[in-house]
Design a protein with these regions (language model features):
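DUTPase catalytic domain/fold
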Residues: 1-105
């Protein structure tokens, strides 16, 4: 049994909304919004030519420019792509990252 929940979304990015890329996908692909980057949440990382460069052991909070109204009692989870972690050492620090009714990304 599945339940459908309507979640209002404001997309201020230039990216399409997240969606399942294949029929067997367990989650949707979320894309970074790199148009208005700030250095406020970069630690051992910097912006160069519109790209975020993360130094070894560095951290960065990357915006999506998506804003959602998540119903109370529900959450979204952000998980790393296994290929990014394996090939480049990029992961989500607090895996899974929880976005609940009090937060939006």
């Amino acid at each position: 049994m599945s339940t459908t929940i309507n979640v209002p979304v404001i997309n201020n990015s230039k990216n399409p909304l997240p969606k399942y890329e294949t029929t067997k996908a367990a989650g949707m692909d979320l894309r970074a919004s790199l148009t208005n980057l700030s250095t406020k949440f970069l630690f051992n990382a910097y912006i160069e030519s519109g790209k975020v460069i993360i130094e070894p052991r560095g951290r960065a909070l990357i915006p999506t420019d998506l804003h959602m109204s998540i119903p109370e009692g529900y959450e979204l989870q952000i998980r790393p792509r296994s290929g990014l972690a394996l090939k480049y050492g990029i992961t989500v620090l607090n895996t899974p990252g929880t976005i609940d009714a009090e937060k939006y990304f």
